[in-house]
Amino acid sequence: MLFRSSINNVVCHGIPSRDIVLKDGDIVNVDVTTILDGYYADASRMFMIGNVSDKARKLVEVTKECMEIGIKAIKPWGFVGDIGAVVEHHAHKHGYSVVEDLGGHGVGKKFHEEPFVAHFGKKNTGMLLVPGMVLTVEPMINMGARHVVLDPVDEWTIYTKDGSLSAQWEKTVLITETGTEILAD
């Protein structure tokens, strides 16, 4: 099992540390990867610590909505672009940006498989969504600009370039003949 925690302006891949103390008003994403019988699953959720500002609360809530509508957009024989189009529209409608450098991914015997699931784009584009595919929907939504930077020291943690807050929710989804099934929540 792998754990990552991303606080405030950390977009993803935050490294847990006993030296970091959460404080009143922080938002934190906890991302957990599990392996069962050689198959991977991935899920994350946001937590709000103490008295969170209305702006931070709205970002967390809208990001969850983005994930949910992204999952609802998945249809057998649809396209990966269908997911990104609805996520991007919902985020922009609320004044947020969508991280474009990172996204969801196929999951199976390997942690990251095809397809790359962009959380922006156009409907009816990208890879065909075939029953039996397993992928993550994990929009990373920023309060500021979409641009991100890699931590030069640990070369793993990714931050918003402008220091703005970022939120992420994630579920692992199986595409079935009739719709979807959530495998990791």
Protein language model regions, located:
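Active-site neighborhoods and metal-handling regions in enzymes and metal-associated proteins
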Residues: 1-185
